[in-house]
Amino acid sequence: MDVLLLAAIALTVGWHSRVAAVLVFVLVLSFQYRNPLVFNAGDVLLRVEAFVIALAPSGAALSLDERRRTGSFWSAQTRAPWPLRLLQIQLTVVYLATFVARMTGEKWPAGTAVSYALRLEDMVIVALPRAVLESPALMNAGTWVVLVGEVLLGICVWKPRFPPIVVALGVALHLTIMVTIAVGFFSPAMMLLYLAFLPSDVAERWMRRRAGPSTV
């Protein structure tokens, strides 16, 4: 666990990024397989993201590796964007696969899934008022908003005009889930996938502001 923590810190700051990324993936895999009883969908997603990062040139920007190469932490190399594309595809796959799985069950099509989830006392972080939980209309509406909303997020995020709005709605959705229900790493991992849709010009402007006039 200590080695995983050190590797994660090294990857975060971009110190020997490729080695650190591979170590993080291998150690995350090892840690998860040694703890099958606490394994959930968030852990699966975290593993997928660690795998993509291990294959990607993660030290090519915002890293100590890049600082050694150019003298500026804020500089960035031009690389093929396939790792970002894989993460983007993963977001849509998660939403569509989740929709299909939910529709094969009983509680989601019946409109009662959200009601059941919010009644699990060992998982609920912030409990809603009893009047809300006992309202069939509100629970039914909430279930279908989540069900249809996630599918629309996974599809509309690819529309050129929609990404900023979709990303904001998606992040808001997962922040809401994260503060109301204990879902482990799932919500943070999903919000990480939304970062892959950040427009390149927005990222470049952000880096230039922090680097100052000497940006490489």
PLM region descriptions:
Residues 1-107, 136-216:
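Extended, low-polarity transmembrane helix blocks
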